């Protein structure tokens, strides 16, 4: 249950998704690291955000909030009143293409390019 996924986007940026099931339960379950323009943001378990190279910001703590409550409130509002979808159809399609490409890559042990 361990996998590393490298995504390379059309604009030249890269993303790496690591999923490891063999770590300690005492370590944060989810961690996001963003590197851009000599700045770094690290979000640990949706509770602690640290920033490096960002003038006037170093860290912030909060309760865990993955946005589910707000997402369902917005979805309910859109269903009642209409409006733009919360996630564009194109984004959903691209996410599915990337998901299927990951599975294909793991099965065939090769890089998979998405058109």
Describe each PLM feature range:
Residues 38-41, 49-52, 65-67, 109-112:
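Short, intrinsically disordered/low-complexity patches at protein termini
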Residues 26-27, 67, 106:
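A generic fold-level signal
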Residues 26-31, 52-62:
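A short, polar/proline- and glycine-enriched secondary-structure boundary/capping micro-motif
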Residues 62-73:
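Active-site loop of classical SDR/Rossmann-like NAD(P)-dependent oxidoreductases
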Residues 1-48, 72-83, 114:
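Contiguous beta-strand/loop segments that form the cofactor/metal-binding neighborhood of enzyme cores
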Residues 16, 60-61, 85-88:
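A short, structure-level motif marking secondary-structure boundaries and short turns
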């Amino acid at each position: 249950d361990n996998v590393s996924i490298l995504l390379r986007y059309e604009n030249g940026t890269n993303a790496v998704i690591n999923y490891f099931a063999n770590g300690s339960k005492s370590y944060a379950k989810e961690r996001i690291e963003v590197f851009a323009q000599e700045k770094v943001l690290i979000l640990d378990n949706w509770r602690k955000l640290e920033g490096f190279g960002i003038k006037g910001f170093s860290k912030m703590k909060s309760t865990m909030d993955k946005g589910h409550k707000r997402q369902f409130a917005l979805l309910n509002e859109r269903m009642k009143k209409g409006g733009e979808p919360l996630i564009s159809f194109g984004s959903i399609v691209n996410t599915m293409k990337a998901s299927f490409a990951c599975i294909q890559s793991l099965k065939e042990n090769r890089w998979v390019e998405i058109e």
